[in-house]
Design a protein with these regions (language model features):
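Metal-dependent phosphoesterase/phosphodiesterase active-site architecture
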Residues: 1-50, 54-179
């Protein structure tokens, strides 16, 4: 998809991923009979959603209705909600977008490097995603999305309770994980 509704960049003085246009995409407009994309993606059991528009890389923890569903940093197993990745860092004449000083709880990994994504879908239960630096080939991000056979993600009628974790600790534990 093109325009993300979760990200942590700043456009001017505010993040344009939290503005009115993004909310309209995310939750829809009941008066116009337009459903929000977030409910549709969640109800259909989507595992991952890739976005562009912003000129950087950012991977989110699984998130729904601004509620973060933490997983380990490099493995999302049986995630209840989609994981979102903004991957618009191939480069452009306007240079990179700037990150907000505040890092929202749903933000797992951010990079301003020019780069590209390599995605391997092995079967119905295993997907491996790597983000690489275009200039030197360095690994920027490494994620496995796995699920048990027959598992169907999706938060049904209420948002489940999430818990806060120390993302720095997760990063140390999972940085070298190559599953």
């Amino acid at each position: 998809m093109h325009r993300p509704y979760y990200c942590s960049n700043r456009d001017g003085k505010k993040s344009d991923c939290t503005g009115e246009d993004s909310e309209y995409l995310r939750v829809g407009d009941s008066e116009l009979g337009m459903p929000g994309l977030e409910n549709i993606l969640n109800e259909r059991g989507v595992d991952i959603c890739l976005w562009g528009h912003k000129h950087f890389y950012e991977r989110m923890f699984p998130v729904y209705n601004n509620q973060t569903f933490y997983q380990t940093l490099n493995v999302y197993h049986n995630a209840q909600t989609p994981a979102y990745i903004v991957t618009g860092c191939a480069g452009n004449k306007e240079k990179h977008a700037l990150y907000a000083d505040y890092i929202p709880p749903y933000s797992a990994v951010r990079s301003e490097d020019y780069g590209y994504m390599v995605m391997n879908v092995y079967n119905a239960t295993h997907m491996h995603i790597r983000q690489l630096n275009a200039e030197n080939g360095a690994l920027v991000d490494n994620l496995w999305i796995t699920k048990s056979a027959g598992y169907r993600p999706g938060v049904k009628s209420t948002v489940a309770t999430s818990h806060r974790v120390d993302k720095e600790k997760l990063m140390q534990i999972n940085l070298d994980s190559d599953w």
